[in-house]
């Protein structure tokens, strides 16, 4: 069974975002793009977006599995930074990543309800 276009778009955006984090994070000066506390807001927004994209790309995943995926992506990102010159891993950054995943959960729930409502409405026609 082919993957629907919305899922393909979500998965494509997810891969692009993860690639931007890991490849972009290796660039000189990447660790100085955002000063404290704005860097935590960026972590929250980026990893919240990852959560939404994971949920859209894998619609059968539970919310806890989506949160676990966000936590894992954040942990891998922080571990990756341990090996980069001028970068450092931080539990505070990972907690901001996790907070982004948590804040995304109500958005994901709402998107799923809208999807079900649209599917029921389409079926009723």
What is each residue range found by the language model?
Residues 54-59, 106-112:
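Structural signal for the C-terminal ends of transmembrane alpha-helices
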Residues 43, 47, 89-108:
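Alpha-helical transmembrane segments that form the membrane-embedded catalytic/substrate-binding core
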Residues 59-75:
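Membrane-embedded alpha-helical segments that form the functional core of polytopic membrane enzymes
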Residues 1-54, 66, 70, 119:
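"…centered on the first transmembrane helix and the immediately adjacent amphipathic helix/loop
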Residues 34-39, 76-98:
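Interfacial helix-loop-helix junctions of multi-pass membrane proteins
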Residues 2, 60-61, 91:
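Short glycine/proline-centered loop/turn elements that form peptide/ligand docking sites
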Residues 110-123:
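Membrane-interface capping segments at transmembrane-helix boundaries
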Residues 25-28, 59, 85, 112:
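Short helix-capping/hinge motifs at transmembrane helix termini and TM-loop junctions
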């Amino acid at each position: 069974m082919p993957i629907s276009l919305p899922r393909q778009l979500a998965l494509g955006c997810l891969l692009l975002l993860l690639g931007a984090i890991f490849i972009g994070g290796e660039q000189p000066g990447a660790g100085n793009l955002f000063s404290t506390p704005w860097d935590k807001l960026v972590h929250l927004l980026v990893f919240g977006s990852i959560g939404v994209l994971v949920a859209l790309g894998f619609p059968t995943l539970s919310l806890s599995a989506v949160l676990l995926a966000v936590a894992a992506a954040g942990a891998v990102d922080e571990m990756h930074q341990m090996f980069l010159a001028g970068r450092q891993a931080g539990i505070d950054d990972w907690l901001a990543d996790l907070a982004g995943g948590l804040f995304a959960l109500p958005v994901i729930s709402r998107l799923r309800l809208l999807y079900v409502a649209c599917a029921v409405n389409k079926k009723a026609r």
